[in-house]
Amino acid sequence: MEVTSVVMVRSEALGFLAYKKRRIFGCSGTVYTHEKRKIEAYNDSGHCTTYVGHNIQKHTAGPGQQGPFFSRGQLLVQQASDKPADESNQDIHQISFPRYEDIKAECPDAKYQYLFTLDDTAFFRVALSHADKMHILEVTGGKFINRHYMRSASPKEYVLAAITGFHLDGWYDKNHFCGRCANRLVEDDVERMLRCPVCGNMVYPRINPAVIVGVTNGDKLLLTKYNGREYKKYALVAGFNEIGESLEETVRREVMEETGLRVKNIRYYKSQPWGFTDNILAGYFCEVDGTDEIEVDMQELSMAKWVSREEIPTSLEELSLTNEMISVFRLDKGDF
């Protein structure tokens, strides 16, 4: 019985950051281009996004490449050190990945499916039997971690790309047959789409739009914590966009539902792909309108409170749009 896994591969010779002296992810808001494809770098607060190259054509995994395997919602890493990779943030841990040659030597009949490319880095998914998966685990000395571990992993330049691999793997895994006529779907040769060769039905990757909301009250920011979720650190009000609803309307509704507050002066900040939950996130800042008395929806949140700039934690992981927005407010870098 085969199970679906994903492999990310990259060229070792080019290293993690460089491609012909071009940075895949640079620093302080620099923007680079390569093959008419823009790649945004880390901005001042460390948040990174990328425009992934979706050139849908035949690609082959080959020697000199390295990367992680994904299997049933978990990631195979060759090294997951208990020692922090960043002494300023004890939650960040260094990981590395097995080489393509090692995997190929142990599983020569594995079939790879191309996902996407980031300059010298190609992402593939691969079908492995359970026995092969356990064998790979043994010979590489690796271990499996879940996708949420990636929020505290390093190096950051591949974390969001790996999470995009999770996103696509889940989409492929859930869409084998046409929902209209039940025939098997095939990959399109031109765009990122699965097509039914019988009835012509087209299936695109599922992307769920959601908002992240920074509600301000003078020099205070509304911070929350989720109820019943794995992530236990500070967050902002957040929620999914509903059918027939503008994103600004989503902002008003989610803030009211979760905290009982009314808001005004809604301002767009920026967006971020978030493959952890198959989202595209849109960040907004707004101001409390009227009373600032909070009525917490305990089904969604375990707490919500106003926090002054001086009280906001400084050691936030740098991956998420949420933490960037919290840091931007703490450093008073926006129009608040």
Indicate residue ranges for each PLM-predicted region.
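Nudix hydrolase/Nudix homology domain
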Residues: 1-175, 230-234, 297-336
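N-terminal strand-loop-strand
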Residues: 75-78, 176, 190-236, 240, ...
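Short functional micro-motifs and their immediate structural scaffolds
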Residues: 183-186, 204
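Active-site proximal loops enriched in glycine and acidic residues that flank catalytic Cys/His/Asp
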Residues: 225-226, 238, 267-272, 288, ...
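The catalytic Nudix box helix
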Residues: 235-270, 284
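Active-site-adjacent beta-strand/loop module that shapes the phosphate/pyrophosphate-binding cleft
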Residues: 272-295
